[in-house]
């Protein structure tokens, strides 16, 4: 719990749902595409596949037949995969990608009919919100690798990630208004990623924007040709994974903590973080390595 303890000492508050023992280990088949969830329930199949190597965890939305819809089962699988050994020093970066031509079509509308009932609907949206908040509060950077269409909650997922790399064939939309369900929860992430008027046009019309438009408005970080997507995403991930985990974790937490503050408060928080950073073993190691003209040897 060292990372969490350190961030708490810095003043980062983890949401209540993250305090409900989210760090419990998953089943032994974590890296198997067909493994069960944390409870091993047959009724909640895992719809994601994962692999981890050299500090980089790849989480793949693996239900292309359903356009990688963020059903409740998919959301629970994604949440488990993100939380799995989140404090392990071996984990440096997470990449979220998808099988098939659609990154994610958003919520499964078949789960949102009257037949499921209000309580079920509330669980779907609460679980989705938990996943998005988890991405924000996770100690390691989380990247989206997008190749295709990302709509509604799928667009929300992209907007929630720390970095997003997309192929030039990708597009993004919040089309819920067209089926009578305004994308209110996707609007939370979208409205914090793009200018207000851009977000509202997307929300009011449901019309898609291209990858280049998404880049121009700040929804994504980079656009590359489809054949270069994986290589470019991995290049970024490998660079991050080569750095100090504790320094990056502190930096990520500080960035999001200061962002909504007024300028004076933001600088106060950031100044505190710089002092805390210098107190880290890796903070001193990096400075000493620079002075001695050698590569730093990070503690993790």
From Swiss-Prot:
Belongs to the enoyl-CoA hydratase/isomerase family. The modification N6-succinyllysine is found at residue 110. This is Enoyl-CoA hydratase domain-containing protein 3, mitochondrial. Residues 34-53 are annotated as: Disordered. NCBIfam families: PRK08139.1. It holds the Pfam family ECH_1. It is found in: Mitochondrion. Residues 1-66 form a transit peptide.
């Amino acid at each position: 719990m060292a990372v969490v303890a350190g961030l708490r000492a810095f003043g980062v508050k983890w949401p209540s749902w993250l305090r409900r023992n989210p760090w419990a280990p998953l089943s032994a088949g974590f890296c198997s595409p067909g493994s069960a969830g944390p409870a091993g329930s047959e009724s909640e199949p895992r719809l994601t596949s994962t692999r981890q190597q050299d500090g980089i965890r790849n989480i793949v939305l693996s239900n292309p037949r359903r356009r990688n819809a963020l059903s409740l089962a998919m959301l629970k699988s994604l949440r488990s995969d993100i939380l799995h050994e989140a404090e392990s020093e071996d984990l440096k970066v997470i990449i979220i990608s998808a099988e098939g031509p659609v990154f994610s079509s958003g919520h499964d509308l078949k789960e949102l009919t009257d037949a499921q009932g209000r309580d079920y609907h509330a669980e779907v949206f609460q679980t989705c919100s938990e996943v998005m908040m988890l991405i924000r509060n996770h100690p390691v950077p989380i990247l989206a690798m997008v190749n295709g269409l990302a709509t509604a909650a799928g667009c929300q997922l992209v907007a929630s990630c720390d970095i997003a790399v997309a192929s030039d064939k990708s597009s993004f939309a919040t089309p819920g208004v067209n089926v009578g369900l305004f994308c209110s929860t996707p609007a939370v992430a979208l409205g914090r990623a793009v200018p207000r008027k851009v977000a509202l046009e997307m929300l009011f019309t449901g019309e898609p924007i291209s990858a280049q438009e998404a880049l121009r408005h700040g929804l994504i970080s980079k656009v590359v040709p489809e054949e270069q997507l994986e290589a470019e995403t991995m290049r970024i991930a490998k660079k991050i994974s080569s750095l100090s985990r504790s320094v990056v974790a502190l930096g990520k937490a500080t960035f999001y903590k200061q962002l909504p503050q007024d300028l004076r408060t933001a600088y106060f928080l950031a100044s505190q973080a710089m002092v805390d950073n210098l107190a880290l073993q890796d903070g001193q190691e990096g400075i000493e390595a620079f002075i001695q003209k050698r590569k730093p040897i990070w503690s993790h």
